[in-house]
Amino acid sequence: FGGMTDGYERYKKIMDNPPENLFFPGIVSPERMRELYAMADLFLLPSYNELFPMTILEAASCEAPIMLRDLDLYKVILDGNYRATSDVSEMREAILEYKNDSEALKDLKEKACEISKEYSEEHLLEIWLKFYREQAALGKK
């Protein structure tokens, strides 16, 4: 996979001996997952490549404010309901901003709720029902 595994050894050392404020829980139950997301002041996904990351939907459903790398994919599927950052320096600045501005963090949390609503089971059901009804109507013509 080339570039996707760059830095593995470096990060493996960190995982083997993490700082006190960082832990790697491994596979967790859905109940524990909700608890962990709810504990987060901010959900950060700095990934360079993604398809459709479920972690974002999980975090949004737990009302965790979301910060992501500025990828074209996110613009399309999340409709701006997150904080986009271009690099680690900008991520750091944004984290410090949110640390000192609870209103901005609250706004980001509300945006997470919008993501959650957009991808809720109820909303997706509405979209699929509309689609199938339209297809059925076309088939009757």
List each language-model region with its residue ranges.
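Nucleotide-activated donor-binding/catalytic signature segment of Leloir-type glycosyltransferases, i.e.
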Residues: 11-28
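Short alpha-helical donor nucleotide-sugar binding micro-motif in glycosyltransferases
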Residues: 27, 35-40
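A short hydrophobic beta-strand element within the catalytic core of glycosyltransferases
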Residues: 43-44
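Aromatic "clamp/platform" in nucleotide-sugar-dependent glycosyltransferases that forms part
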Residues: 48
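Short hydrophobic beta-strand element within catalytic cores of glycosyltransferases
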Residues: 65-68
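A short, well-ordered alpha-helix in the C-terminal region of glycosyltransferases
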Residues: 104-118
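C-terminal alpha-helical cap of glycosyltransferases
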Residues: 121-141
